[in-house]
Amino acid sequence: MPKKAVVLLSGGLDSSTVLAYALNKGFEVYAISFDYGQRHLKEMKSSEAISKFYNVDRKIVKVDLRSIGKSALTDNIEVPSRDISTIEEEIPVTYVPARNTIFLSIAAAYAESLGTNEVFIGANAIDYSGYPDCRPEYFNAMENALSLGTKIGLKEKFHINVPLQYLSKADIVKLGVKLNVPYELTWSCYKGEEEACGECDSCQLRLKGFMEAGFADPLKYSKYPEFYSKNLVKLRPLKRR
């Protein structure tokens, strides 16, 4: 009988790849998505589409982080457009205070209710926006805290699986292509428009990943950054098996 695992599923490129990865490793996957008052609610539709594609159970948890505020993802603060070369220089206004700590705590509670000590998250510490709760030392500390603070953790160590942690965005895309991830169903843009903006950190890092992997991103963008548009003709269309 396969072991159960809870996968944090936002509907983005990374979390969708991790869900496919966990399934490929033989886990019985239970997805969990968070409606936290984010402006880019389109990602919730993507997480629904991904969970239906893979036919996995998906739990939606509402945690209104707008009451805490101080993030461009939840407040009326402009989402910045930065040069991709400067993205990791400082923590941007899109950082949501303690978001991963809140989400992982709830995901761990869900996992414990299912009788498992396995949680998967699609965080990455290579091509990322510099969020402090995406670093390896953070996940090590959080894993120890959950092992100490849960009933199941007293019997066996709680595992926060971060399989994409040391992969570049290009490597993540390549892994997803190998796993046949339906990237056309995913959503990464921080803005909740009909088309992805192509300017926010998340869009640029995603496009950089596809470009360096040699594939064209299947999503529609209202604007492409120059580094991507000048290489677009060289990129292969993404075709799933």
From Swiss-Prot:
**Mind telling me which HAMAP family this protein's record contains?**
QueC
Q: Where does Zn(2+) bind?
A: C189, C197, C200, C203
Per UniProt, the cofactor note for this protein states: Binds 1 zinc ion per subunit.
Enzyme Commission number: 6.3.4.20
The UniProt keywords, alphabetically, are: ATP-binding, Ligase, Metal-binding, Nucleotide-binding, Zinc
Q: Which Gene3D superfamilies match?
A: HUPs (3.40.50.620)
Keyword NADP set for record? no
**Protein name from the UniProt record:** 7-cyano-7-deazaguanine synthase
What NCBIfam families does the record tag this protein with?
7-cyano-7-deazaguanine synthase QueC
Pathway linked to the protein = Purine metabolism; 7-cyano-7-deazaguanine biosynthesis
UniProt xrefs under InterPro entries: QueC, Rossmann-like_a/b/a_fold
Write one Gene Ontology MF term: ligase activity, forming carbon-nitrogen bonds
Give the first-level EC class, as a single word. ligase
Which SUPFAM superfamilies does this one have? Adenine nucleotide alpha hydrolases-like (SSF52402)
Functional note: Catalyzes the ATP-dependent conversion of 7-carboxy-7-deazaguanine (CDG) to 7-cyano-7-deazaguanine (preQ(0)).
| Similarity-based family | Belongs to the QueC family.
Cofactor dependence is on: Zn(2+)
